[in-house]
Amino acid sequence: MAEKGKGSFGYLKKQAIKQGLFALGLLAVCATIFLIGFFWLTQHNTILTVIAVLGMLPVAKFIVSMILFMKAERFSCAPHLYEEVMKIAGDRKDDLLAGFDFYLTSYDKNFPLSVACVAKDCLIAYTPSENCDCNKCKEHFEEYMKKNGISGINVKVFTDEKKFLERFKQVRDDETNENEKAMYRLLLNLSL
């Protein structure tokens, strides 16, 4: 299980803060460049104004990312679920292909996954969202598995926490193969 970055517990909340701080920092740099040009050259029609305006493009990108992460963070893994998963994982927690706080986006739907695990040739995931279309999520995974040459992995998305934990107990003891590792990398790549 990942301790930092995608797949780590609290990732969505940390990323929302990180994106916001980057946006504020870049906004301050752009404002400083504009104000230096305005007060130093006493007009706003300068190359420094152009640089400041072009600098707003990355600021806008970070603001959009921040908004996406802020929207997704309400689906972060609950602390009690994290503790339960870690308890079940036990001494295998470093070997398991499992992670927390995934938020997948597609053209027409978004899929928040609090916990996901790849083992025994299957991807199991839990979503706390009652509105998550589990069949669409499965189709989304299968489409990208096909595009990436991954086969033989069954996808199951649970909306019931207890059923997910029961299935997680069943798959936790299995050794991982290369196909499962490729599937987990795909999960990380598809997530925000």
What are these model-derived regions, one by one?
Residues 1-99, 106, 139, 146-151, ...:
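Surface-exposed interaction regions that form or flank ligand-binding interfaces
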Residues 89-126:
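Acidic, Ser/Thr-rich low-complexity segments on the non-lumenal side of membrane proteins
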Residues 122-154:
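Structured, soluble extracytoplasmic/luminal domains of envelope-associated proteins
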Residues 156-158:
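Hydrophobic/aromatic beta-strand patches that form the interior of the parallel beta-sheet core
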